[in-house]
From Swiss-Prot:
It comes from Homo sapiens (Human). SUPFAM superfamilies: Immunoglobulin, MHC antigen-recognition domain. This is HLA class II histocompatibility antigen, DP alpha 1 chain. Residues 210-222 are annotated as: Connecting peptide. The gene is HLA-DPA1. Disulfide bonds join 138-194. Changing residue 221 to A: In allele DPA1*04:01. Residues 246-260 are cytoplasmic. It holds the Pfam family MHC_II_alpha. Residues 118-210 form the Ig-like C1-type domain. Changing residue 114 to A: In allele DPA1*01:05, allele DPA1*02:01, allele DPA1*02:02, allele DPA1*02:03, allele DPA1*02:04 and allele DPA1*04:01.
Amino acid sequence: MRPEDRMFHIRAVILRALSLAFLLSLRGAGAIKADHVSTYAAFVQTHRPTGEFMFEFDEDEMFYVDLDKKETVWHLEEFGQAFSFEAQGGLANIAILNNNLNTLIQRSNHTQATNDPPEVTVFPKEPVELGQPNTLICHIDKFFPPVLNVTWLCNGELVTEGVAESLFLPRTDYSFHKFHYLTFVPSAEDFYDCRVEHWGLDQPLLKHWEAQEPIQMPETTETVLCALGLVLGLVGIIVGTVLIIKSLRSGHDPRAQGTL
């Protein structure tokens, strides 16, 4: 086995082992009914990103620890005002995980783990109105290990401005999901693709999206419908008038009255 193949196998098996260990509590939480659930998720690996430490509350991201800047980053500013978390706590956990990773690499039998390919969907954040700013969301789901290369294409050309992404978010089945965002102005002429590369895919996966123009009815159809509606309205008025007149006449008909 080539050295690079061996390292690939090591990465896969170690990542699977670490995810099982640190997401194990999520599996148990799924069997218990609870009003609220908080989740810490942490992993390290030999491929970028080299690690992650984050916290969720009821599946909403609260904060993560920036491993390069060594600081806590809150998803919303209000969270940081209401709660606190020392980044050193997350960094200490990452250091322990790295030590465990090195030990597992040395003791691993290099058994290849399964790479789970992602499921990808693309959708707009808001209802689409041509010419109105919006955000395209690319949701990459149910993949393992947490290694992705995601790019946006507009009319087949690479887009680098107006892009953003989430962290790798844990799932209760030990896999991950992730969001990538693209701010754009919908146009009838433009089309977009979210291009995803992952070890579980034989080739890059492109998920296509383009604005759907509203269906315009021909003028002749609109005219026919308007005329039909007008005719039905007139018929209703005539029928109603006839029924009212008949009702009034029957009320004044002597034969309809009882015996004196």
